Amino acid sequence: MGQKIHPTGFRLAVSRNWASRWYANNNNFAAMLQEDIGVREYLKKKLKNASVGRVVIERPAKNARITIFSSRPGVVIGKKGEDIELLKTELQRRMGVPVHVNIEEIRKPETDAQLIADSITQQLERRIMFRRAMKRAMQNAMRLGAQGIKIMSAGRLNGIEIARTEWYREGRVPLHTLRADIDYATSEAKTTYGIIGVKVWVYKGDTLGRNDAPVVEEVAEDKRPRRNARPGDRRPRRDGEGGAPGARRGAPRRGAGKPEDGKTGE
């Protein structure tokens, strides 16, 4: 099932965190969720050229904190911070509460799944061959530290009449392993022949918990080596196995005692 389920939803509360971090009762949940969806669609359209990887929305105490992860933070902020002030004003109007906007820079955009998918779709819209775009993205990701990447494109590739699906993979992408840090994203290319869908999986290594800490194997208490133990040491004796080291354990073999009268051993 790891091949079918959404990789992010499969790992929520295990190795991934939610993109919307707030709590609401049953009466307000639907309205707040609809607000989040509208904000994400607005930011995706407004910051189309800013290389936005993901958006995290938090709602602490009748406020809203929106964190935008972008590889081009200068485009989001604008000249002297003008663009971000206009953005903040529009978000406050949409959400109805004071909004704080934070910008986080993505250091390695070549290994971010959303940015890879968006880059491929932009190339497809410019009529670049899909194989060339996919292989170039895979090479850049592996060169900058990704342990594995898989890219899938589906639709009327190169304008053919019958739609098909093609995918390429490099490295390893363990979708069943919960501790594996799998970054997954999708994007759509709107071409003259129709829509081409792009899916990207990027394996960045194993994590422990939601803080992206490295996995450290703990040694169990009963498996810890003894302080002065050596490889050639004897195993501990069981009860009833005392005696000298050369003593024979257990009952003597039958006929192994004194020879009977009139018989001598040969």
UniProtKB/Swiss-Prot annotation:
SUPFAM superfamilies registered for this protein in UniProt: Prokaryotic type KH domain (KH-domain type II) (SSF54814), Ribosomal protein S3 C-terminal domain (SSF54821)
Superkingdom classification of source: Bacteria
GO biological process, one term: translation
Cross-referenced SMART domains: KH
Function comment: Binds the lower part of the 30S subunit head. Binds mRNA in the 70S ribosome, positioning it for translation.
Sequence similarity: Belongs to the universal ribosomal protein uS3 family.
Name of the molecule in the record: Small ribosomal subunit protein uS3
Species name: Burkholderia multivorans (strain ATCC 17616 / 249)
Gene: rpsC
